[in-house]
């Protein structure tokens, strides 16, 4: 029994207005080749399939065309797809009746029955190519406050926060019931959350737990679970001795992820081997200048000149993040960058300009607002931020905005 675990596709993402559709098409094609080459029996997608709560029609077509293609290539392939915090949970489930006929299980929301979580829906048997059940997967969507019975925000259970305690209780009860059904078969869980000890991507992953808890310890997942396939953290990594695994995102979703070894995770139940990371090719380069820290404008311009860039349209070119240290007025920096980038097949994904602390004037004592004007305050703030006086167009725009207040 061979299971492939992936997560955090973020279909529909844009960077500074640039579409990433071509990258998602390339990844989904690569994934299809891996499914066939590795003779995968089941594909687990642990949340954040889409990048936003209102995915475009094209983003949805891209997803469903890929799923249909995988099943067409291997009619016995089983696919289990759960929601993440970015996903529109109910919209994800809308075509469930059709997808179920293709062997695709979609869990966007938590379903309950009289005895707790509805295991007829959330516990899914995984079959090998001979049709024999070889494992059971407990598929958990992204959990919200209402999904945690007994949650009392602000309360603490011993040394644990309220959310951790409520999640631990939910998993203990549910996994015990699921394990009784699984018997001697391996029991696998899917979830979308942050585990303590996991390495996060700066600025890329929202802190999604409630009630003040940011992360839960890996031991909230009971020992009866042979493997836990997680989504949310974009760096591929293992916790709890390898039992708890983040597959990571398929390619960089922000500048902080440029150095990651993106890929998918293969779990071979028959061989009993540790989960295996399968690297994915990077569809489009993502660059950061400088690689670390910041640099002044002349160094950035020189680095741009040294880049060996592919001969392709800008809309297909590498993504670029720039981190500058201001050595002149910001308006001069942006004008110089605009001129330099105009001739290069690069897509500017992000720009930060910081001023050295030594260049910042000492904080002035608070002004008596009865002795100044809004325009004078605007001009002072503009000087502090840009190192130069506001131009007439800046003052005109400020006056227009002020007149609307």
Curated annotation (Swiss-Prot):
Single Gene Ontology BP annotation: DNA metabolic process
UniProt cross-references to Pfam families, sorted A to Z: Metallophos, SbcD_C
Transmembrane segments: none
One function term, GO molecular function aspect: 3'-5' exonuclease activity
Keyword annotations from UniProtKB, A to Z: Exonuclease, Hydrolase, Nuclease
CDD domains: MPP_Mre11_N
Family that this chain belongs to: Belongs to the SbcD family.
Subunit structure as annotated in this protein's UniProt entry: Heterodimer of SbcC and SbcD.
Annotated PANTHER family: COMPONENT OF ATP-DEPENDENT DSDNA EXONUCLEASE, NUCLEASE SBCCD SUBUNIT D
Protein task: SbcCD cleaves DNA hairpin structures. These structures can inhibit DNA replication and are intermediates in certain DNA recombination reactions. The complex acts as a 3'->5' double strand exonuclease that can open hairpins. It also has a 5' single-strand endonuclease activity.
Matches recorded under NCBIfam families: sbcd
Full protein name: Nuclease SbcCD subunit D
Organism: Rhodobacter capsulatus (strain ATCC BAA-309 / NBRC 16581 / SB1003)
